[in-house]
């Protein structure tokens, strides 16, 4: 079912990991953990497991950027299968909210990314039509979407020779929220030319041409929308809805009745409590929405009535992407130590915001049922699961152990307390598969413990050694003040150093790391250098100051993650400055010793020569930023010198291309540049909008 394409075969620890994980899935283990060191090929290992078990697979990552990277990797491994991408389709999103203290209501404000919306619809279509599906998703997959039953009821299967009139087919298309447009042929549109109907499916790149002869479908053709050229003839095809939230007319009419009933009850409650303002507010807002639903079939914020539309009882869980998978699907949670807690925290944040809206008459109580899954509901939706992480949390290890020992798990298992401890190298925990030996032959960095006294002088000497070899150094401190003072001191004695602090935005942070890789400076000082994206093959030394101060930044997990920043260099080394051998340091040293011994023995046995990771430096995001500033400057100095309209068109094309390539930072910068040009074209003053929730500004999601 799955055809894995790769220019290399499993190597190092990958073959045994693939075999064990595959055996676990086939034997019915509900929870397994893949504990893999940095650079061990965890994604390739999971890809081989997917190929072996032949199950539809959902891969969850904790942010869009990492999800995009995983999507690209799986797409390259499975070019002949359906690899889909399911993340939030908002370029920016400001949820509606009310601040009682200032009596401020913030309207919902958002902009959808059409390409990501297409990919989401493509995901749902693939899950309905085939089993060889891999969906890479962010944690937004736990939010509610349309009902699977409604979606399935609305699809239009057609075939050559089917008795179906053109008029009935057109009516069905409109029910699926397609729009007729005989001029522009965009996704979600259809056009009519005599007995021929051309449809642009919302989840596909191509178009469908359906030719009728009387009351019968005579021919179905797939064609290229831009040129109109035929791509292939089809015997049958399924037309899927143009939107994710679709329902039948019968259900919509029923929903309107139940919404009116809830509205009447809510008004009486407010009037009984002498909250006349809230009663008037909820009456006015809800009746306007009902009017729109009766006339147009949709209203702004219709998702807040999803419980009524789908006919769910109060308090029931929402319909999510999980419902579209068959019962035997495989779940993979990437970077599980970060993703699992994020899944657990989303429900409470959403509930607190909506509760305020309900209490003050902006929304009906049923709006609280338009929400993400809570953690127990998520556990109830889990099927067989593989947790992937270099530092899995205690509860993931415990679930995996219980699943392997008892032989049955419980996706509804008791929620264990969070922990940061990783698997001991000497304990073969059942259900936990380790990837220690890298395909490149690289061994874990050597770890040296040095006393705190004289740590700065020693650090300077070590930094200069690396600088002479054109290698880079990361230095992590405990406090912002220490980091700033150390940076100033190193700079004063002639060392080329920069400080990575929390006030740097995402794009500037990427630029700092890029400059480090290019050799524009030699030393990067920071407090928490564990964040995703610190893939720096040029770094040969990681220095951890005050390593014996037990806590979050010096825990076993933090030490392992920080040390991994030097794991891609042939001469990688980690120096811990400490006077006390804390429990975290002892565990970290034990893990490192075990890994190095195993890696070195494997290399000797197989005559492998380790080699550093080589990776090209990505194009600078600052290029796009400087382009925007340059365009703004040109417009200010003389907007008549350029054709603004054509420039906007060019930038829009670039933005769509960037979104299609999943380069969202570039797309966002281009979008902002387009807005600035449009403001100049309209003759309005430019507005600078900072990221702030309270000041009614836009926040990114």
Write out the residue ranges for each language-model feature.
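N-terminal cationic and glycine-rich segments that engage phosphates or anionic surfaces
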Residues: 33, 86-135, 139-401, 427-458, ...
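Conserved helicase ATPase core of P-loop NTP-dependent helicases/translocases
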Residues: 504-526
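Walker A/P-loop
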Residues: 27-49
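Conserved pre-motif I regulatory segment
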Residues: 1-35
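Conserved RecA-like helicase motor-core motifs
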Residues: 78-88, 301, 434, 472-474, ...
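Conserved strand-helix element at the start of the C-terminal RecA-like helicase core
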Residues: 56-68, 85, 275-278, 466-488
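Intrinsic, low-complexity polybasic segments
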Residues: 402-409, 419
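Pre-Walker A (Motif I) flank of P-loop NTPase domains
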Residues: 26-33, 54-56, 132-133, 471-472
């Amino acid at each position: 079912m799955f055809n894995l394409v790769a220019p290399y075969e499993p190597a190092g620890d990958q073959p045994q990991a693939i075999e064990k994980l595959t055996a676990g899935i086939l034997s019915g283990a509900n929870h397994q953990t893949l504990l893999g060191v940095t650079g061990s090929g965890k994604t390739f290992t999971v890809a081989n497991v997917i190929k072996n078990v032949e199950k539809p697979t959902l891969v969850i990552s904790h942010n869009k950027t990492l999800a995009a990277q995983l999507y690209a990797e799986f797409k390259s491994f499975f070019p002949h299968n359906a690899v889909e991408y399911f993340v939030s389709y908002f370029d920016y999103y400001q949820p509606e909210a009310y601040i009682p203290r200032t009596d401020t209501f913030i309207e919902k404000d958002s902009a959808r990314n059409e390409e990501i919306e297409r990919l989401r619809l493509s995901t749902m279509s693939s899950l309905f039509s085939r089993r060889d599906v891999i969906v890479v998703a962010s944690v937004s997959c736990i939010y509610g979407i349309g009902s699977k039953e409604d979606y399935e009821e609305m699809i239009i299967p057609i075939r050559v020779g089917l008795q179906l009139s053109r008029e009935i087919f057109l009516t069905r298309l409109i029910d699926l929220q397609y729009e007729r447009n005989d001029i522009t042929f965009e996704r979600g549109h259809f056009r009519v030319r005599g007995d021929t109907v051309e449809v642009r499916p919302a989840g596909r790149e191509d178009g469908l041409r359906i030719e009728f002869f009387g009351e019968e479908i005579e021919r179905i053709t797939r064609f290229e929308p831009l040129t109109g050229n035929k791509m292939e003839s089809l015997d049958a095809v399924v037309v899927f809805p143009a939107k994710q939230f679709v329902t039948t007319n019968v259900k919509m009419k029923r929903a309107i009745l139940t919404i009116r009933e809830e509205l009447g009850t809510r008004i009486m409650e407010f009037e009984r409590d002498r909250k006349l303002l809230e009663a008037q507010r909820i009456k006015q807002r809800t009746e306007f929405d009902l009017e729109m639903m009766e006339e147009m079939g949709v209203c702004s914020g219709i998702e807040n009535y999803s419980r009524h539309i789908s006919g769910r009882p109060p308090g029931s869980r929402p319909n999510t992407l999980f419902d579209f998978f068959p019962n035997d699907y495989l779940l993979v949670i990437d970077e599980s130590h970060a993703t699992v807690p994020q899944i657990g925290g989303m429900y409470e944040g959403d509930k607190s915001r909506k509760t305020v809206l309900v209490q003050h008459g902006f929304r009906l109580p049923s709006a609280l049922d338009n929400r993400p899954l809570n953690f127990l509901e998520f556990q109830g939706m889990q099927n067989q699961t593989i947790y992937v992480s270099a530092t899995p949390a205690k509860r993931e290890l415990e679930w995996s152990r219980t699943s392997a020992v008892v032989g049955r798990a419980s996706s509804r298992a008791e929620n264990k307390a969070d922990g940061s401890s990783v698997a001991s190298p000497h304990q073969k925990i059942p259900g936990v598969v380790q990837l220690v030996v890298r395909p490149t032959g690289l061994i874990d960095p050597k770890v040296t413990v040095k006393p705190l006294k004289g740590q700065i002088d020693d650090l300077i000497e070590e930094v200069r050694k690396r600088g002479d070899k054109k290698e880079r150094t990361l230095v992590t401190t405990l406090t912002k003040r220490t980091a700033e003072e150390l940076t100033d001191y190193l700079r004063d004695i002639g060392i080329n150093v920069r400080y990575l602090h929390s006030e740097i935005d995402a794009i500037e942070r990427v630029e700092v790391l890029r400059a480090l890789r290019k050799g524009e400076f030699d030393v990067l000082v920071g407090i928490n250098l564990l964040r995703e994206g610190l893939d720096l093959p040029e770094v040969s030394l990681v220095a951890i100051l005050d390593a014996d101060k037990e806590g979050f930044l010096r825990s076993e997990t933090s030490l392992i993650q920080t040390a991994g920043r030097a794991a891609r260099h042939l001469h990688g080394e980690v120096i811990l400055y400490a006077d006390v051998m804390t429990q975290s340091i002892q565990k970290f040293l034990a893990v490192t010793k075990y890994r190095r011994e195993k890696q070195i023995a494997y290399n000797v046995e197989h005559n492998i020569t380790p080699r550093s990771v080589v990776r090209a430096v990505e194009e600078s995001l600052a290029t796009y930023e400087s382009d925007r500033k340059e365009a703004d400057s040109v417009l200010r100095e003389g907007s008549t010198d350029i054709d603004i309209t054509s420039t906007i068109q060019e930038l829009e094309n670039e933005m769509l291309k960037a979104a299609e390539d999943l380069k969202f930072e570039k797309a966002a910068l281009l979008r902002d540049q387009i807005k600035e040009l449009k403001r100049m074209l309209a003759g309005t003053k430019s507005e600078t909008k900072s990221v702030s929730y309270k000041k009614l500004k836009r926040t990114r999601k």
